[in-house]
């Protein structure tokens, strides 16, 4: 379905690639993968990268609580013993390029991250620069035993040597396409769509 004019006057086509049931299934699969890779749920902490990564971390925490009894405290969401957020704004490499971003709050889970397996949670993995900023931000907070990355969508086009450990959907895209995730908590619905012709 057409979505009108892009900023450069190019017609943009929009294609839906994931809807609510697909996103739910992807998060359930990621939760099982995380538990399998960690041999259970002990010493695991989720840190969502705001904005939508934080929402996904909360959802993932609830899914883990459904599967793993020791994750029941994660039902409390951000700030619980197992789920937090990690603001990467001041660690981004595009700060001096006129791209304005409002800082978010970093919320470390009550149990901290030292000696834990930290799973960074983000919505869309693209260039890898946000994840690099997250790794930098993590250094100032503590010393986890290991850091893993879970993303809902990996769209390719990496500019840095970064790879996700857990991916909900690999979505090959062209460089002039934009992948957008809407979540009910922030946008009113659960959808992943591709806008074509957006640079």
Placement of each model-derived feature along the sequence:
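PRPP-associated nucleotide enzymes
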Residues: 1-199
């Amino acid at each position: 379905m057409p979505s009108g004019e892009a900023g450069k006057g190019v017609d943009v086509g929009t294609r839906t690639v994931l809807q609510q049931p697909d996103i739910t299934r992807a998060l359930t699969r990621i939760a099982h993968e995380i538990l399998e890779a960690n041999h259970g749920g002990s010493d695991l902490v989720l840190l969502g990268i705001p904005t939508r990564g934080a929402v996904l971390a909360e959802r993932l925490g609830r899914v883990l609580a459904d599967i793993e009894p020791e994750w029941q405290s994660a039902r409390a969401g951000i700030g619980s013993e197992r789920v937090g957020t990690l603001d990467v704004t001041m660690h981004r490499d595009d700060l001096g390029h006129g791209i304005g971003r409002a800082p978010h709050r970093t919320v470390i889970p009550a149990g901290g991250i030292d000696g834990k397996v930290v799973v960074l949670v983000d919505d869309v993995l693209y260039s890898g620069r946000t994840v690099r900023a997250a790794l930098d931000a993590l250094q100032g907070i503590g010393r986890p035993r290991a850091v893993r990355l879970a993303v809902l969508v990996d769209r390719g086009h990496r500019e840095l040597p970064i790879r996700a450990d857990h991916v909900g959907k690999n979505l090959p895209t062209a460089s002039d396409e934009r992948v957008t995730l809407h979540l009910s908590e922030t946008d009113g619905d659960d959808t992943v769509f591709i806008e074509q012709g957006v640079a």
